Amino acid sequence: QRALKHFNEGTTDRAPSQLTVPVSAYTDEAQFEAERQAVYFESPIAIALSLEIPEPGDFQTQTIMGVPLLITRDRDGLIHCFINVCRHRGAKVCSAEKGHQSRFSCPYHAWTYSNRGDLIGVYGEDSFGGVDRATMGLTALYCVERAGVVFACLTPGKSFDIDNWLGEFADKLADQKLADWHLYTERWLPGAGWKATLDGYLEVYHHDSVHGKTVGPYTVGNLLVHDTWGAHQRMVIAKKNISELNDIELDSWESPESYIRVVHSVFPNLSISAILGGHCLIGFIYPGETSTTTATRQLILSA
């Protein structure tokens, strides 16, 4: 209803005032390092979708901001996230991108770990010498699942309260039913600095000029219905056929997806965009090595 009102009146949701941000907020390297540490290493970030590791025994590996990760689901269905490095000499424990197995052996000296991170085998232990297996498991990173998303903190030993982090936005996230979608394809995309990249996910001002051959012809440029829950956001974008609702009684309206697109943004790095034809576009946005680079893992899901 809000989107239709904007369409009829040629308006959009607006901030109370304009905000001008200095270029240095995007390019200053000292500020970049401080923000990257506080936002991406000491706070919860989204690292995967539950549907990517759906079954007990499934695993996935990634390298995020230089940190090699091994994400597993154990036999009880619990999700785990480890630094993908052997505790002996630092070799990568698992080189496969994804698969199904319950144990992982380091290719260097064959130390073996369970998918719960426990050290369960030391090659030639009798001659190697005693190893305190209880303290030499894979380095765990705190992680939890909520609403089909895997969240983790990249600083070992640091935890978080995901319910407090998401707040009332948790219900909006759960409504997306992300665990019920299917992964069609994925890719990594290089780009500008993480804040400049993230800005592009939070407005539709660019739709007509940038997306003229894709979603642009179907959506109304610079018409936005915007709501926030703390740092998390939802954008509603009107499709051009929304004018049809002027001739339909409210109680006879079809599903909203026929007339709008909805984008949910989970701070700091996850964008969930329902797009045309029963597909969903997922973006995991991570800072690159400098203030002017970024890496985005983009997934396309099908219903």
Predicted features and spans:
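Short Pro/Gly-enriched beta-strand edge/turn motifs at strand-loop
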Residues: 41-53, 122-127, 264-269
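C-terminal catalytic domain of Rieske-type non-heme iron oxygenases
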Residues: 73, 84, 144, 149-303
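Short, contiguous pre-domain boundary segments
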Residues: 3-22
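Non-catalytic accessory segments flanking enzyme active sites
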Residues: 19-64, 69
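A broad, structural surface signal
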Residues: 33, 37, 41, 84-87, ...
